[in-house]
């Protein structure tokens, strides 16, 4: 796919939890807990207009869901700030200094005075109904590993509560995560292809991680990806769980927008105009139905309603992403706006136990061949779902709607809510403006001393190639590598190869590789008991509690002394000549003999 000609623009929002001693706006410890909560409270959130009288569309959408929220907490690690019963404390200075340090790393312009803002969040994940956030810096630019990275903004904010369960209109959150400091780095739109966007995301994440101030573990880093193409619309994709999924998410979103543009073009070609809401109760058609889906609804006193969609024949079945069709998009909207489980559309019928005869009867009642079937027991839900479907189909005439979508594990996405507007942000009235003091700047300078470029330089100075150094930085073995280099007099390149290549290859074979085994091998290399060529076989055959030296003796892989090497080199030269001796010696004695010893012996004996 030629992304440049498609006008691809991608923006990243990288969210990273900071490893501080306290939460951002209170003094509770930032720890997640799995033990039984000490208390639960119930809240319902209500909409209020901003100071300018504006209402945010995303907030309005959430309010219409009429949900009930349960919050779980602990007496020793949850306080009244998290329960929105006490004003917030002043922000944690350690978190502020870290955010300023990251801003310096990307040459961003740091504000002299920080103002805390309230960002309306009414999905229940913030007890107060808003998230506290503060803009730290803007307009950063830096070239790293050949990538020109433009940073639009760097913000410091509180993380949301942790969702524990959801059933119907009730959502359960735990307050342990609420308030943990979170740094958000938002990039300028970039035109790099998907694989390179993944690399940029890694660079940004590692730049924070290398400070030692980032939390580690599952869920501590989250990526949002904004994608648009020429003629399409900006789509925000929330919660991409893993960096490796970013290229797929971008690729599939481009595919989706292209498909929606083709659908729009086809509808215009057909002369399809704005749809008016028109529904017909077709429950009687299914009096003797064999469809399990329909029977299940009818047995609970429900009904089947058909929505007329003239001109949409063969449109609902158009694939917009792998395994997802335009009809799936409509079903996502229905599930998001109502409690209904989805819908059926005319392009997939007959099917699901619905017969061709039943389809003909529906068409006869409607007077059109294209329709959507909705099933449920609540008339208001059915009416709302029908309205949602017609609104989305009318949007399809224009092309691609601006949406916030959620990432699925396979890289496809689903509709979450409309894109938020500017009305969701307003000043926090309980916290005064914060000056960036000399003390904060001094702390930030200490934190910013380390960098990705500095770490690369440090590793290449040890004799590692730039590619190998990058592999090591991206791997989980960097700290172990540095530890082993400080403990064993073994060439750093050999240590890196053992960690990155040999250990991984053996692990794929099902061989258990432990720190103790690697340490034993490095000790044997240092003492010249084994050669680097023997490492893989020794590790493969090492049993628990066995040393590398014991394994080498058992396998006959103990390294030859230099005197032995000279002896075998002389014998082989007499057999095959000097020119072929090196290769022949290594072939015969591989694993027991070091190539540098062979070269030295040849040089001393014959040159």
UniProtKB/Swiss-Prot annotation:
NCBIfam families for the chain: gatE_arch, PRK04028.1
Enzyme class label: ligase
Name of protein: Glutamyl-tRNA(Gln) amidotransferase subunit E
Matches recorded under SMART domains: GatB_Yqey
Origin: domain of life: Archaea
UniProt KW Ligase keyword: yes
GO annotation, cellular component aspect: cytoplasm
One biological process term in Gene Ontology: glutaminyl-tRNAGln biosynthesis via transamidation
Reactions that this protein is recorded to catalyse: L-glutamyl-tRNA(Gln) + L-glutamine + ATP + H2O = L-glutaminyl-tRNA(Gln) + L-glutamate + ADP + phosphate + H(+)
Family: Belongs to the GatB/GatE family. GatE subfamily.
InterPro entries in UniProt: Asn/Gln-tRNA_amidoTrfase_suB/E, Asn/Gln-tRNA_Trfase_suB/E_cat, Asn/Gln_amidotransferase, Asn/Gln_tRNA_amidoTrase-B-like, GAD-like_sf, GAD_dom, GatB_C_1, GatE
Lineage start: Archaea, Thermoproteota, Thermoprotei, Thermoproteales, Thermoproteaceae
Pfam families: GAD, GatB_N, GatB_Yqey
Enzyme Commission number(s) of this protein: 6.3.5.-
Known function: Allows the formation of correctly charged Gln-tRNA(Gln) through the transamidation of misacylated Glu-tRNA(Gln) in organisms which lack glutaminyl-tRNA synthetase. The reaction takes place in the presence of glutamine and ATP through an activated gamma-phospho-Glu-tRNA(Gln). The GatDE system is specific for glutamate and does not act on aspartate.
Keywords: ATP-binding, Ligase, Nucleotide-binding, Protein biosynthesis
MF terms in GO: aminoacyl-tRNA ligase activity; ATP binding; glutaminyl-tRNA synthase (glutamine-hydrolyzing) activity
Assembly and oligomerization: Heterodimer of GatD and GatE.
